[in-house]
Structures are given as structure tokens and as C-alpha cells.
């Protein structure tokens, strides 16, 4: 995964930043906000179906936009003023705000329109996460128009997609795997063969990126075998198998997961390390991130579904236990998951697949819902309802003040979170972060 700008990832003190994280700058493995929990509350989410109105059609028709803004403004106001958190359909409200703030002139903008900055084209990672977020709202028009914009990233030489149309050399396996998921979902939504063909082409390309000792190379023509590229490739394969019934896809996915457990699992806490060198598997980067575990859980429960392999289910349960260990690498000192939203949303996705495919994961439901409610309550901007910050440490004073009603700690003000570095202006939001938030809120509504 990659992008532009600087985000700060809170890592456990024993870990270094994973090698494949392009959006994170960590100069020292320190925790920025140290807090002590003084209270918590768990709320259950309500199961909902996706609203049927098309946000894409609304934002490409000014006449419809005014009506939709009016109808949703009441919902936004109600959800932000209520004393009891009710995630419910909030994923739809957040998607509305994403269209409102990042869509204009027929294209997606990586910059928040509230800040009036110059246009910046989103990288492929962002577009893939955004595509899946739009899928969650059931908005066929939105998926189609977004995939149409993504076609400018297409690389005819590989039949995969570039990190950016402005860079004709960077092709990342993990970004392409996520995009394959979007094409697969688009095919299911529309029946259009072109979407299935693109998904097949992407998976075929990714299969050419297998290292000599297994695993999936993270970036074309490089040596790094990333955990995330390996497990996202496996997940793309099992999702594609669900349509094509090509058994070779299950073999490929199984090989990927076997590589992970053999070469990149920490024997102590059972989580996965970040990656290794394709020519020397002993060179292991020992960073750990939530999205690797989330994609692994999804892949394993699908493999169990399709093959009836008990070992796959047992391994998924092992990872679920490791991911929810409050003393583990994914937790801060307050019992909250410590990863940025753009990583942790795939852990929520993994549990969503697990809850749906096996009753054995029900023991983890309360913990996962608690984590989602933490995001809904404390990472949502109180001055900009339905939009989110990636971490409490990367938020605003008013956001932290609400947080500090239940948690004690310190907060360092950072003017760079505001438009034009001016605290009197809006806090700028990130497209990738809020596309991730849409997915988290959707899973919360359907657990």
C-alpha cells in the first residue's frame, strides 16, 4: 500500500515500521499518545441493508444533489447529536460526505475540497479502497463511474494497474489485489463481463509475481515479499473462484497461505511478520499490521468453505485469537486497536467474513464491535460529523477533548491537520481514511 503525505502509526515499542508501508514515517518506535482507560461502553450494531438511492447519480445531477443533501442532513444531525452511539446506517452518511468533499468535475480528488487545494489524483490504493466502500452502499452507478476513472491507471503491458497514471513503472501486487476485489463485486452487481475479465487479468498478473521460494512480490521488479501482497492475492483468488470455479485458484490461495504460516508467522504471538526477501527468506521484517491478519482470516474461512479443510478453519481461529489478545501487538494501553483506519478496516472485513461463514467466531463479536464503536465515538470529528481521523493522535483538540472524557492522556496540537495549517479553518480529511471508515461502519451495521 502506498500514498502521499505523512501519517504516524502507533507501533508497539518492540516493533519497527514494516518495510512495505509507504504512507508511514516512523523515526522512533514511540507511542505518541499514552492514555489510561477510565471507562468504556459497548453498543450493539443493528443489521441493515444498503440504502438503494445512488449517490453517484445524485452528485452528477445538481437537481438531485440539493434534494439528497436536505434528506441526509437530518440524519447527519441526528447521529452527531445523539447521546447514545448508533452506528446503524452511518456508513451511508459517511459515503455521502465522501462524495460531497472529494468528487468534483467528474473525477475523484485526493484533497479535501473544504481546503481549496489544487487537484491531486488519488493513487490506486486509495481508488481500490474507495471502490469497495461504494460497493458497500449498493450504488451501481457509483461503482461504474469510479471504475471508469480507474481505467486511466491501466497498464496494457501487464494487464494490471499502475500505482498512478503519472508513473508508468510502479505496479504493486497488493493494490492490484484489492482492485480485483472491486472488479469481482462490480461483476456480481452488474453482470458486465468486462469487470470479470479485468479481475482475471489482475490475478494472472499477480501469479507471475510469485517469488522463487513462494510468496508474492510486493512491487514489480523488486525483491520484497510482503505479507500483505501474499494474503491479498490469496483472497482475490478465492473470491474469483467463487465465480469461475477454477480449482487452480484454490491451489494458488492455499500455496500463499502455506507460505505465510511456514515463513512469516511469529511463533510467540501467532501474528504475521511484514515480509521477507525473495532470495533470502531469513531476512524477515518483523513489523506487524492488522490488515494482514484480516485478509488471512477471510482467505482461510473461504478455503474452509470451499474445501471443507478443518485445518484452515483452525488456523483462522488461531489468528482471530491472536488479533484480539489485549496484550498483543495490535492494542494500545487502553484496549483499543492501534492501527490506522486504512489498515484496520481489513481486520473488520476479516471478522465479517468469519462471522458469516462460521458460528465458531461468535466469541469474538463483542470485542470487534467494541473496537468499531471506539472508532465511531472517538475518531469521528465532532465539528465535521460523519468524517473521521485515522488515529486520535492525528486528530484535533476538540476530538481529543471528547475522547478525554473517558480516557486520560496528553495531546500535542498539530496545525498541519487543518486546512492551510490554520486552526481557525476546517480540519482536512483524507479520502483513503474515510473510504476505510465507510467499510468499518458497514461491517458494524451488519455484524
Regions found by a protein language model. Name each.
Residues 1-20:
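Fungal secretory targeting signals
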Residues 15-96, 148, 152, 377, ...:
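Fungal extracellular Ser/Thr-rich, low-complexity intrinsically disordered regions
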Residues 84-133, 140-174, 225, 318, ...:
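CBM-like carbohydrate-recognition segments
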Residues 132, 181, 201, 235, ...:
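Residue-level signature of alpha-solenoid helical repeat scaffolds
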Residues 138, 187-188, 241-245, 304-308, ...:
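Short coil/turn linking the two alpha-helices of tandem helical-hairpin repeats
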Residues 145, 150-243, 251:
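Extended ligand-binding groove/face enriched in aromatic
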Residues 230-233, 237-241, 249-303:
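Active-site cradle of extracellular carbohydrate-active enzymes
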Residues 292-328:
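Oxyanion-binding "anion nests"
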Amino acid at each position: 500500500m502506498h500514498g502521499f503525505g505523512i501519517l504516524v502509526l502507533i507501533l508497539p515499542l518492540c516493533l519497527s515500521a514494516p518495510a512495505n508501508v509507504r504512507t508511514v514515517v516512523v523515526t522512533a518506535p514511540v507511542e505518541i499518545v499514552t492514555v489510561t482507560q477510565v471507562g468504556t461502553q459497548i453498543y450493539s450494531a443493528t443489521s441493515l441493508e444498503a440504502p438503494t438511492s445512488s449517490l453517484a447519480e445524485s452528485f452528477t445531477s445538481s437537481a438531485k444533489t440539493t434534494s439528497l443533501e436536505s434528506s441526509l442532513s437530518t440524519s447527519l444531525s441526528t447521529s452527531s447529536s445523539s447521546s447514545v452511539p448508533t452506528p446503524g446506517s452511518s456508513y451511508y452518511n459517511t459515503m455521502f460526505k465522501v462524495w460531497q468533499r472529494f468528487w468534483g468535475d467528474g473525477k475523484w480528488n485526493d484533497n479535501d475540497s473544504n481546503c481549496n487545494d489544487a487537484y491531486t489524483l488519488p493513487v490506486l490504493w486509495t481508488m481500490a479502497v474507495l471502490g469497495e466502500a461504494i460497493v458497500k452502499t449498493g450504488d451501481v452507478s457509483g461503482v461504474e463511474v469510479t471504475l471508469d476513472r480507474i481505467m486511466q491507471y491501466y497498464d496494457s503491458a501487464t494487464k494490471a494497474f499502475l500505482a498512478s497514471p503519472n508513473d508508468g513503472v510502479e505496479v504493486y501486487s497488493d493494490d492490484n489485489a484489492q482492485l480485483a476485489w472491486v472488479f469481482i463485486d462490480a461483476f456480481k452487481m452488474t453482470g458486465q463481463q468486462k469487470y470479470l475479465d479485468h479481475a482475471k487479468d489482475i490475478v494472472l498478473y499477480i501469479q507471475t509475481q510469485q517469488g522463487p521460494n513462494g510468496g508474492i512480490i510486493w512491487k514489480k521488479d523488486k525483491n520484497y515479499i510482503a505479507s500483505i501482497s501474499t494474503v491479498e492475492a490469496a483472497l482475490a483468488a478465492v473470491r474469483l473462484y467463487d465465480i469461475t470455479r477454477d480449482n487452480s485458484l484454490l491451489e494458488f490461495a492455499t500455496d500463499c497461505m502455506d507460505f505465510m504460516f511456514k515463513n512469516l508467522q511469529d511463533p510467540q504471538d501467532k501474528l504475521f511478520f511484514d515480509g521477507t526477501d525473495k532470495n533470502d527468506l531469513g531476512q524477515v521484517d518483523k513489523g506487524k499490521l492488522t490488515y494482514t491478519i484480516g485478509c488471512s482470516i477471510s482467505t482461510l474461512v473461504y478455503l474452509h468453505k470451499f474445501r471443507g479443510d478443518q485445518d484452515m478453519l483452525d488456523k483462522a481461529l488461531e489468528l482471530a485469537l491472536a488479533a484480539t489478545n489485549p496484550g498483543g501487538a495490535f492494542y494500545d494501553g487502553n484496549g483499543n486497536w492501534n492501527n490506522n483506519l486504512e489498515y484496520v478496516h481489513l481486520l473488520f472485513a476479516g471478522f465479517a467474513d468469519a462471522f458469516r461463514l462460521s458460528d465458531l467466531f461468535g466469541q469474538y463479536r463483542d470485542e470487534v464491535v467494541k473496537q468499531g464503536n471506539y472508532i465511531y465515538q472517538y475518531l469521528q470529528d465532532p465539528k465535521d460529523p460523519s468524517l473521521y481521523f485515522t488515529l486520535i493522535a492525528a486528530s484535533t483538540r476538540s476530538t481529543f477533548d471528547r475522547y478525554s472524557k473517558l480516557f486520560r492522556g496528553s495531546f500535542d496540537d498539530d496545525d498541519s491537520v487543518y486546512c492551510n495549517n490554520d486552526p481557525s479553518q476546517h480540519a482536512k480529511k483524507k479520502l483513503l481514511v474515510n473510504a476505510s471508515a465507510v467499510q468499518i461502519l458497514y461491517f458494524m451495521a451488519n455484524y
